[in-house]
Structures are given as C-alpha cells and as structure tokens.
C-alpha cells in the first residue's frame, strides 16, 4: 500500500496527517508513505524527524486582493503542479490524502488529473480557501464538524469523521501524568494555555488573577505562558503569589506533551484552534475558550461557538475580556461538581475517538 500525504504550514495541518500515518502503519504491515510539503513550513523539520520520507514543492499562498502577488501565485502554483506530477509519477501512490494548507492545492489537483483517488480532511468548521476549492474534486472530503457541510456544498462526497488527532489521545495511557507533572491528587487542576508563542491579552489577565485564584480556591494551576512571555511572567508571579502557595503553581514556557496535561486537568483555558479542540474533546476535559481574533475567516470563534452551544465549553471574547468575568467563569465550573460532570459528558458526546480509523477505512476503500 502506497500513500502520498500532504498538508502543511502549521501544526494544525501536520499533526492530523501524522495521526493518519500512524494509524495506517498500525493497520497495515506494509505501507509506503511519502509526505509532500514545502521547505518553509513546519513540516520540513517535523516529518523527517519522524523517519518519514519527505519531498518539498514550490507553493505560495493566495492573496484575496487583486495585486501582483496573484501573478506570482499562479506562477508558483503551475510550478508546484508540475513538481507534484513528477513526484506522483515516480512514487505511484495508490491514494493521496491532504490535510490542508496551500501545499495541498497543486498536489491534490495533480493527483486528480492523473485519476488517482484523493481524500481531503478539514479540521475547522469553516474550511480554508484551498480545501473548499479542492472539495469539488476530492473523492471524499472528511470533516471534523458536521457544520462544515454548510460551507462545502459543492463537495463530491462529504463525511464527518472528526479530527484524527483525537484518536492519538484516546489510545494513550496517561496514568503516570500526575506524578510526572508533580500534581497533588487532593486538588482540582486548572490548565492555562497561552499558545506556543503566547497571547498578550490572556497573559495580562492571568497575571492579575492567579494570586486571587490560588489563594481563594482549592486548586493547582499549570500555566503555559508561551516562550515570548515566560521570563517576565515568572518574575511577576513570584512577586505577587505568596510563598505558601507557590508549590501549587507550575509555570512552563512550553509543554512538549500538552495532551498529557489536558488529560489530567479538570478545566482548561485556551484558544480554540482545531487541534486543541480535538484534544479537549478526546480527553473529555471542560474548557473556557478565548478564540484568537487574528485568524483567517475568524475560524476559532466559529469552532468555539460549536462547543459552547453544546455545553462543552464556556466561550469568552478577547476584546471584552476582564478579570472578574474570568474569575467568575472559573469558579462557576471548577467549584461545582455537577457543572463539571455535565460539561465532561458534553465533550464526550461531540468527540470522535476513532477518527483516524474511519479515515484509514476510506483510504483503503479507494484502493
């Protein structure tokens, strides 16, 4: 079985692809994988480090405004299309799957023109411009949220599978996480995630409320500040938080295994990226979501809205974020066992614990 996988730019496209690759290897004794990305995206480092064959093509993002960049886009698209044709001809895949990002455009188009079966996966409720276009040609379009079907009305065939990243969470054993993170079993755990680089507004708010949270509530806090803010936050926190409470505050610039922390948390405060939501629902962890306003199509707000409407999350907006509202939201959830239970049940109802398996079944059916 030979599978060509493409998707890149950000972890939100790469990690779902890796989840599918891992499941394919579990299901098939012999599977040959080629991952096609770009030399500028995160995939050019992540994929080879996983021992997966990698090839890069030329691609450029499409500008929505009419300008000279669109000429360059067309030039690079045609170049990428030719490069994709050569790669596909040499590799001869049985099926091609794309998980989003501009690199999917020329790769899936070339595969489609060469009559090779193609599958597309969309992680967000609102599809990216590339995936929306490609859904017209892909044999199957797999979506993480059923609501995505409203935005991909011209898709040939669309099916809700969930995000394959979720299956990697449900299949793991997290029994030793509490000990590894040095957490107490007699306290509720609040996980605050500001992103890999950090989010200024979230961090500014958290710095001011953590001393009150940790002194008033029987909780322990894991706070992932982001690399850009760690040193300044650490110095301020040590100044504001009483020494007697500091053992209940775990500060990290970055956590390499964030799903492990999510799995042992009682409540998570985070952005609303697609991968994060897949991890939250897979771990059945309630959340307070603060969508980033700086993303294309405002997709984090729409993602968060789905969880909020189904009772799995409380949604706050960054532009109206204030300290007392955050404290009130945390208290109303983490100090109420009934609310926690209801939110946990809601996350379970919208999780897709076998997403990677379902996608692999589709890939296998096309061969």
From Swiss-Prot:
UDP-N-acetyl-alpha-D-glucosamine binds at residues 10-12, 124, 196, 300. Keywords: Cell cycle, Cell division, Cell membrane, Cell shape, Cell wall biogenesis/degradation, Glycosyltransferase, Membrane, Peptidoglycan synthesis, Transferase. The keyword Lyase does not apply. One of its GO terms (biological process) is lipid glycosylation. Its main location: membrane. Its EC number is 2.4.1.227. It comes from the Bacteria. It is found in: Cell membrane. It is a peripheral membrane protein. GO terms for molecular function: UDP-N-acetyl-D-glucosamine:N-acetylmuramoyl-L-alanyl-D-glutamyl-meso-2,6-diaminopimelyl-D-alanyl-D-alanine-diphosphoundecaprenol 4-beta-N-acetylglucosaminlytransferase activity; undecaprenyldiphospho-muramoylpentapeptide beta-N-acetylglucosaminyltransferase activity. Pfam families: Glyco_tran_28_C, Glyco_transf_28. Transmembrane segments: none annotated. Cell wall formation. Catalyzes the transfer of a GlcNAc subunit on undecaprenyl-pyrophosphoryl-MurNAc-pentapeptide (lipid intermediate I) to form undecaprenyl-pyrophosphoryl-MurNAc-(pentapeptide)GlcNAc (lipid intermediate II). This is UDP-N-acetylglucosamine--N-acetylmuramyl-(pentapeptide) pyrophosphoryl-undecaprenol N-acetylglucosamine transferase. It comes from Natranaerobius thermophilus (strain ATCC BAA-1301 / DSM 18059 / JW/NM-WN-LF). The lineage of its organism: Bacteria, Bacillati, Bacillota, Clostridia, Natranaerobiales.
């Amino acid at each position: 079985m030979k599978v060509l996988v493409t998707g890149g730019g950000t972890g939100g496209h790469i990690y779902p692809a890796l989840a599918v690759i891992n499941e394919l290897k579990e299901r098939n004794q012999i599977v040959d994988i080629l991952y096609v990305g770009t030399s500028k995206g995160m995939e050019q480092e992540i994929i080879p480090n996983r021992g997966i064959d990698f090839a890069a093509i030329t691609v450029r993002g499409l500008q929505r405004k009419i300008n000279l960049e669109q000429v360059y886009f067309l030039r690079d698209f045609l170049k990428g299309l030719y490069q994709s044709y050569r790669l596909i001809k040499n590799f001869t895949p049985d099926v091609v799957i794309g998980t989003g990002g501009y690199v999917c455009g020329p790769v899936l188009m070339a595969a489609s023109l060469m009559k090779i079966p193609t599958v597309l996966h969309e992680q967000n409720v609102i599809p990216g411009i590339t995936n929306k276009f490609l859904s017209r040609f892909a044999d199957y379009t797999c979506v993480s949220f059923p609501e995505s079907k409203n935005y991909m009305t011209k898709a040939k065939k669309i099916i809700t599978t969930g995000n394959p990243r979720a299956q990697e969470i449900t299949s793991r054993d997290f029994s030793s996480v509490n000990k590894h993170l040095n957490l107490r079993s007699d306290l509720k755990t609040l996980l605050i995630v500001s992103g890999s680089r950090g989010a200024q507004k979230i961090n500014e708010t958290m710095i001011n409320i953590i001393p009150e949270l940790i002194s008033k509530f029987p909780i322990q806090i894991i706070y992932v500040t982001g690399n850009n803010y760690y040193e300044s936050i650490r110095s301020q926190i040590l100044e504001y938080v009483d020494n007697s409470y500091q053992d209940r505050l775990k500060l990290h610039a970055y956590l390499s295994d964030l799903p492990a922390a999510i799995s042992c948390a009682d409540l998570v405060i985070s952005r609303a990226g697609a991968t994060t939501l897949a991890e939250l629902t897979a771990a059945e962890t309630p959340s307070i979501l603060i969508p980033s306003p700086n993303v294309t199509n405002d997709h984090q707000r729409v993602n968060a809205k789905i969880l909020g409407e189904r009772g799995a999350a409380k949604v706050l907006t960054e532009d109206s974020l204030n300290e007392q509202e955050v404290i009130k939201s945390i208290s109303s959830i983490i100090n109420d066992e009934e609310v926690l239970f209801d939110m946990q049940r809601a996350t379970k109802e919208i999780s897709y614990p076998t997403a990677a398996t379902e996608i692999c079944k589709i890939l296998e059916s096309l061969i």
